[in-house]
Amino acid sequence: MRLDELPKSARIEDRRGVTVARGGIGIGTVVVLGLIGWALGIDPRLLIGGAEMMSRSGGPQQQADAGSTTSTGSPSDTMGQFVSAVLGSTEAVWTDYFAQAGQTYKPPTLVMFSGATQSGCGFAQKAMGPFYCPIDQKVYLDTSFFQDLERRFGACNVGSKTCQFSQAYVIAHEIGHHVQNLLGVLPKVQQAQRAMDQTEANSLQVRVELQADCFAGVWANRGQAKWDFIEPGDVDSALQTASAIGDDRLQRRSQGYVVPDSFTHGSSAQRTRWFTTGLKSGTVASCDTFRNEQL
């Protein structure tokens, strides 16, 4: 992945190395990446349905002081510069898209942390994987997740330069949730899930996640047109990652069998299909997972 021409984002809070006191444990309306549950032996159904949790708790969790060592702006280290470049590219792509629709894109902040931190949706831990919190409109990322993605789950070839594009796909997926929030998709889904049983809520959540995968593909398409940043092997690497974090593959790895009714992010085939859909079309209209009967 070529990064040289990508705009750098300053909308980063660097909390790596910052120790925080644990506050409330509510996860709120966190939208999580699928690796969380089945890979670590945690039922992911406990980590979604955040709107219900928020209604019971009465609002966002009180955040602890992140400490005076939190810095803002583009970090100077290699990983920080990479995240800044990917985030900057998403800002440019989605700013253009919203402008074409006569709207204004309000970019999220990305929080880099190590181990644990506080979010507007509650206490965040490394085991949760990257996630987007609609309450504070921030993406939370413990970058050691990328090591797990590569070494433990074979999401891309460890040490290969193409792993960068896989990592960028993960970030673009979370930004996709922010786009969903701005478009009003997340609030509607959360409202609908309140009236559903767990199986129905899971099924709807899958459509949310697959749309975020498609939006990540839209970012890749439009970013390629702007900066020609995709190198040979990059797309295959991203597809390998999407497949590696499919619910069926994670369940089979963790428990030896698959329970489709418990899927919350989609199968490997579905995730790769929807990322590819966005990548080929470059249009948000192609990402309507809610009206598509065949996922």
Where do the PLM segments sit?
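Long amphipathic alpha-helical segments used for membrane anchoring, targeting, substrate engagement
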Residues: 1-76
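Catalytic zinc-binding patch centered on the HExxH motif and its immediate surroundings
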Residues: 116-148, 152
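Short pre-active-site segment immediately N-terminal to the catalytic Zn-binding motif
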Residues: 147-170, 200-206
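Catalytic Zn2+-binding segment of zinc metalloproteases
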Residues: 175-190, 224
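Pan-zinc metallopeptidase signature
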Residues: 243-295
